[in-house]
Regions:
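Post-signal-peptide N-terminal segment of Sec-exported extracytoplasmic proteins
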Residues: 39-72
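Surface-exposed, short loops/turns at beta-strand junctions within beta-sandwich domains
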Residues: 93-102, 186-196
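Edge beta-strands of extracellular beta-sandwich domains
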Residues: 115-124, 209-223
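Conserved aromatic anchor
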Residues: 51, 143-155
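Bacterial Sec-dependent N-terminal signal peptides
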Residues: 12-39
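Proline-enriched interdomain boundary motifs that mark the N-terminal boundary
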Residues: 128-138
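Aromatic sugar-binding surface patches on proteins
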Residues: 78-95, 180-183
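Beta-strand-rich modules
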Residues: 111, 188-218
């Protein structure tokens, strides 16, 4: 009888220990590719492919991409969101007058525990042109800076960033407007001091209104001295 009691006690202890084990983290990532367009020095639209890979529940060690035309590249990790966000910010020399290859992009993601997973994302040939910024100026009372632009054809939404040098001062969430004009309170910029500010306006074209995956993004910019 004592032996049976001992075996039962051991079984209960083992059951308790098994319940204390950590749940296995399921590595998963979100991938997206979209066409980014800007105006070059001659004012002509040029294009590049921009990629984003994000993990919400597991660190990423590396990301490699194969484009539909067979070209390969490695993505850099976000220096702030270390291990959870990888992306590329095209350099001026990466932009071409021709659109990026349309088709299926294949992403090989290596997680911190060395598990490797493959994801795909498709890119069509749809793009939008950079906005034509009409004006960037202070209001008459000096309280705000207003940026106005011509509506971007096919854009579902817009996004505005304000930079001073390489430092981002303001970044809005995507927004829609009836009249393409937005004001930024000067008090929002005062903490960064006097100097030249770059207003960077992006048009956004989504693959669908349910997922908000980007198909295309266009960016135009203009400077103002405050």
């Amino acid at each position: 009888m004592k032996k049976l009691h001992l075996l039962a006690l051991v079984a209960l202890i083992m059951l308790g220990l098994s319940g204390c084990e950590k749940a296995t983290v399921q590595n998963e990532a979100f991938v997206d590719v979209f066409i980014k367009s800007i105006a070059n020095a001659q004012g002509m639209p040029v294009y590049a492919a921009q990629h984003t890979v994000i993990s919400y529940n597991g660190g990423i060690k590396s990301v490699s991409i194969v484009s539909p035309d067979g070209a390969t590249m490695q993505l850099d990790g976000d220096p702030i969101d270390t291990g959870y966000s990888f992306y590329n910010e095209p350099a001026e020399t990466d932009y071409l007058t021709t659109l990026p290859a349309a088709g299926i992009y294949t992403y090989t993601v290596t997680f911190d525990d060395n598990e490797v997973k493959t994801y795909t994302n498709s890119l069509s040939a749809l793009s939008i042109l950079p906005a034509n910024i009409l004006s960037l100026q202070k209001s008459a009372d000096g309280d705000s800076v207003y940026i106005s632009w011509a509506s971007v054809i096919n854009a579902h939404a817009y996004q505005l960033k304000v930079l001073k040098g390489a430092t981002q001062v303001i970044a809005t969430n995507p927004f829609t407007v009836v009249t393409p004009k937005v004001g930024i309170p000067v008090t929002s910029l005062n903490s960064s001091g006097a100097g030249v500010y770059t207003f960077q306006l992006s048009g956004l074209y989504f693959e669908s209104t349910t997922t908000y995956d980007l198909q295309a993004k266009s960016t135009a910019k203009m400077d103002i001295t405050l």
